[in-house]
Amino acid sequence: MLCCSLAASNARAEKRAIVPKEFATGPGATGLPYTPGILIDGTLYVAGQVGRDLKTGQIPTEFESEVRNTLDNAGLVLKAAGLGFEDAVAVQVYLTDMELFPRMNTVYATYFKDPRPARTTVGVAKLVGTARIEITITARK
């Protein structure tokens, strides 16, 4: 019995790529070698999302719009995995200017309801292109 339990616990969990159709083609497609989300053992790991408008491929100049786009893009990955913002357990926010923190928080609060996920916000020197914010999410039903 013990050998069977050990063998079962060593089995690799199936890892599934989550790629929303909106990410696959068009101006919003990055062509970068990464997967927007990985689902394994019921936990979704959302890769860093920026505020690129998926219709134009551009990042808005208005910061609140950039934050909304960033969260909407992350939301597409959550939805493609059958999850939503209410399933988020951890969020990492990267900002190129910590002075933008209060403005980010105002938009962020409209997406995440109580109990809100654990969150870390980090100031960074640079993000891809003109992005001022990048967000990663870990979610689980």
Predicted features and spans:
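N-terminal presequence-like segments and the immediate start of the first folded domain
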Residues: M1-D72, L76-V89, L95-K141
